[in-house]
Design a protein with these regions (language model features):
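Catalytic core of nucleotide-sugar-dependent glycosyltransferases
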Residues: 1-233
Length: 233
């Protein structure tokens, strides 16, 4: 692992943990390094994981749960002498879940995790790179879009490709969709992990890309959808 990729687990430790779990039993949770859910939503996610029996890897970035402009937008990466940006961490969850869960703070070997046979689902913000990686490796996606084109990517996953779902919530007293709670999250995870058709479709679609993605398709949603449509005909 490169020295500038700070984390509390090495790649080998992550691999060995995955090796100890049944095939398709682990959900991988990562929201990227820029914008994630709020602190309150992270707490609901932690409750959902605590109360379930689900194996999971949860990646938490420095500054998670904070509002405002991410530090990655403001300039060069901080040096080793600078303090890490503090953020949300599910205190005590690792003790409660024991070996059922792996909570990674900092950088995670995403391709290693997604490509491992024990990984059976990906709870994702639906960022473009993460979405493409999951599609290419045949991993079903549970979308938690947060901004911009992530919502389009979530619809692509759920409605067009049919290789996953988007978390849904009920309606609040004001008639607008409310924030996700632990029950919404738990229901979405359970649905994703047990849906045989979604898993079969994800594996089937990944075989179309065993030779790789065209560059234009990786870089642009429109080109990718067009490429998918051509493959389907």
């Amino acid at each position: 692992m490169r020295t500038n990729r700070k984390a509390n687990y090495t790649e080998d430790e992550v691999f060995q943990w995955l090796e100890s779990k049944p095939i398709g039993s682990v959900i991988y949770i990562s929201f990227g390094s820029e914008v994630g859910p709020s602190v309150d939503e992270y707490k609901e996610l932690a409750k959902a994981l605590e109360e379930s029996s689900q194996h999971f890897i949860w990646v938490i970035q420095p500054g998670s749960g904070k509002t405002g402009i991410p530090k990655s937008f403001l300039g060069p990466v901080q040096t080793d002498s600078e303090e890490e940006e503090e953020g949300y961490y599910p205190e005590g969850l690792d003790t409660i879940v024991g070996d059922r869960g792996l909570i990674i703070t900092g950088w995670a070997p995403q391709l290693l995790i997604l490509s491992h046979p024990s990984t059976g689902g990906f709870l994702s913000h639906c960022g473009w790179n993460s979405t493409v990686e999951a599609i290419g490796l045949g991993v079903p996606i549970l979308g938690w879009p947060l901004r911009g084109d992530q919502f389009d990517n979530g619809r692509l996953v759920a409605n067009h490709l049919k290789i996953g779902f988007v978390i849904t919530s009920g309606v609040g007293e004001d008639g607008r969709p409310r924030r996700f709670n632990k029950d919404d999250i738990a229901a979405g995870v359970e649905r994703l992990m047990i849906d045989v058709e979604v898993h079969e479709q994800a594996k089937k679609l990944s075989k179309e890309f065993e030779s790789g993605f065209p560059v234009s398709s990786v870089n642009a949603l429109g080109s990718f959808v067009e490429f998918i449509s051509q493959k389907a005909t």
